[in-house]
Amino acid sequence: MQVMVEGKEMVVTPGLQAHAQKQAQKITKLSKHVLAVRLFLETIKKKSNDPTANQVTYEIDIPGNDVVVRAHAADMYEAIVKATDAARRKLRKLAEKQRDLNREEGLAAS
């Protein structure tokens, strides 16, 4: 499983890279089916304390689906944490949906 962190119109510092990698590992622990995780960090040129100045986009490759999650925050570290939480919720929801479908198929077959 590979994790890629890229900056759009910004330089990704080693501290930011380490934080993003650590957060992405939380996603990979959630599901064994995650093939790849791409993190795009972007700073939007606006006012200094704009709550949407920093955007983080997760692209998560899983069999059958690609999950895309975005989050905004005034601080890049906070945006990474928000995006990670949103991605974890979305993956849990997909896993639960798949379990329900498998359960229904098992009941219908018997």
Which role does the model predict for each range below?
Residues M1-S110:
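N-terminal, polar/charged subdomain of small-to-medium soluble alpha/beta proteins
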